[in-house]
Amino acid sequence: GHRAVVIQRTEAEPMLSNTMVENSPVHCTSVGKAILAYQPAEIVDRVIDAGLQRYTESTITDPEALRAELTRTRERGFAIDEGEHQPGLRCVGAPIRNQAGHVFAGISVSAPAWQLPLTEVDKLNQVVIYHANLISQRLGYVRS
């Protein structure tokens, strides 16, 4: 589909909301791009054909730019959202694989960009990838 379903979202501040289910666009969120990057080309084409809605000035709306971003995501093993869905928010997401090795979910961490400078993304992506791999293994995925 064209959206990623967020099952749990917890804010750092206890007084802020704790979202249980939320639909998020796959083309401009780190968790969405982490999932979309590993889908067949037909799925990516369907997302593009449905329209790449602009949410912020940073949203990727060009089909070729999205394809290039998905390629970078696969090469890195994680996705980055640089305020593409919500202004000023930086997010790092990694794919979760099922027993057959297919990416069907993702996990991400988000923070205001001023609290998560680009220099810290390399450290955070390692943590996110580690936990995505751990979840994948618990679901029966065995890396070859």
Regions found by a protein language model. Give the residues of each.
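Amphipathic alpha-helical effector-binding/dimerization core
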Residues: 1-50
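Alpha-helix N-cap/loop-to-helix boundary motif
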Residues: 23, 27, 36, 58-65, ...
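Generic alpha-helical structural context detector
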Residues: 33-37, 71, 133, 137
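Short, flexible active-site loop motifs that bind/organize anionic cofactors or intermediates
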Residues: 34, 56, 111
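Cysteine/selenocysteine-centered motifs that mediate thiol-based redox chemistry or coordinate metal-sulfur cofactors
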Residues: 42-54, 129-144
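Intrinsically disordered, low-complexity polar/acidic regions
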Residues: 55-56, 87
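Extended hydrophobic
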Residues: 61-132
